[in-house]
């Protein structure tokens, strides 16, 4: 474990039930239980390449690193979050396994050509932008939660393009988008093989 390089407002947290530590900032971004659920849901490939789309501060990839030896490529559009992810990777001495790309998903073809990805992990923005949208959040949370810089259509299109023929996409999303997810996946020749609904508490 290396020494943490912290900036104003940042703290180091230990990831749930692991020895991995992560740099967080409540005003910018902090991981939620969705990241834990996503990283534990799929059977991860033990070799090859895993790509974490909409990576935020790197929580999903860091969680996944405890369960696989595969290379993990975390892609995040926001410079501040990508920087936090990079420093968390250094903090945990994972630079040989994990790498961060700070760029728009629209430019992913610059970094990954062809169908060579074994698994995609994705905790995407959940909410469509419409007249009812609450757009008064901080810019960091706004981009993380709302389909402004990317959307479900683009994520499925990317998955169709970069996954190997036997590759898999694991995604966490809101139940009210379920039918939309199925339709969008089908439009891009993706078929759900396993679905798990998660309830916040018994009886909900």
Regions found by a protein language model. Give the residues of each.
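Class I SAM-dependent transferase core
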Residues: 3-45
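Short, structurally constrained coil/turn elements
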Residues: 16, 44, 94, 186-189
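General small-molecule cofactor/ligand-binding pocket signal
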Residues: 23, 99-101, 193-196
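Conserved SAM/SAH cofactor-binding pocket of Class I
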Residues: 41-122, 128-133
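Mobile active-site "lid"/loop adjacent to the S-adenosyl-L-methionine
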Residues: 124-154
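Conserved Class I SAM-dependent methyltransferase catalytic core
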Residues: 149-200
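SAM/dcSAM-binding transferase cores
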Residues: 203-204
């Amino acid at each position: 474990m290396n020494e943490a390089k912290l900036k104003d407002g940042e703290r180091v947290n230990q990831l749930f039930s692991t020895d991995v530590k992560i740099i967080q900032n409540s005003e910018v971004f902090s991981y939620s239980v969705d990241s834990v659920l996503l990283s534990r849901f799929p059977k991860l490939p033990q070799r090859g390449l895993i790509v974490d789309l909409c990576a935020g501060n790197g929580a999903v990839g860091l969680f996944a690193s405890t369960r696989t030896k595969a290379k993990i490529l975390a892609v995040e559009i926001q410079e501040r979050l990508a920087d936090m992810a990079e420093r968390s990777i250094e903090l945990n001495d994972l630079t040989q396994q994990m790498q961060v790309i700070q760029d728009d998903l629209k430019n992913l073809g610059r970094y990954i050509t062809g169908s060579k990805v074994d698994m995609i992990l994705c905790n995407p923005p959940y909410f469509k932008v419409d007249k009812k949208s609450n757009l008064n959040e901080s810019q960091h949370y706004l981009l993380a939660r709302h389909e402004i810089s990317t959307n479900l259509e683009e994520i499925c299109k990317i998955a169709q393009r970069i996954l190997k023929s036997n590759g898999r996409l694991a995604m966490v999303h809101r139940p009210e988008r379920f039918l939309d997810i199925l339709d969008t996946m089908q439009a891009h020749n993706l078929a759900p093989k396993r679905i798990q609904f998660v309830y916040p508490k018994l009886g909900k």
